[in-house]
Amino acid sequence: MRARRGRGAYLSGLAAEEQTARAYQKRGAEILARRHRNEAGEIDIILLEDGILVFVEVKQRKNRAELAESITERQWRRLGLAATHYMMTHSDETGAIRGCRFDAVLVGADGRLEIIENARSFDEH
């Protein structure tokens, strides 16, 4: 039973990330990576939008009230470290950027997306 729940959560997370990527692409963003892993951590989606390098954390919850609080300080720190590592190791892709930001995308059980741009400052990491 637990394995089924874990697989269901995994597939649900993939669907939320796919929905998020499509939403950004509709806005004209270029997806650079999905589920990027490096020694510092994992980043759900990395994209380029209007010259800005965007690191996106996607969260899905049944209860929308829990969504905004579902990204912990520890997760933000790891995301910041992973983003720094990405920029250092992908300077050929990131050399012409005008800046970077961290977005949080909250996906409710109803499938609605809420994109929170600049959910966290890069300086806070």
Predicted regions and their residues:
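Short, surface-exposed charged micro-motifs
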Residues: R35, D44-I46, A104
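A short beta-turn/loop motif at secondary-structure boundaries
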Residues: R35-E39, T94
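A generic beta-sheet turn/junction motif
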Residues: N38-A40, E49-G51, G108-A109
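Short, low-complexity, polybasic intrinsically disordered segments
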Residues: V107-H125
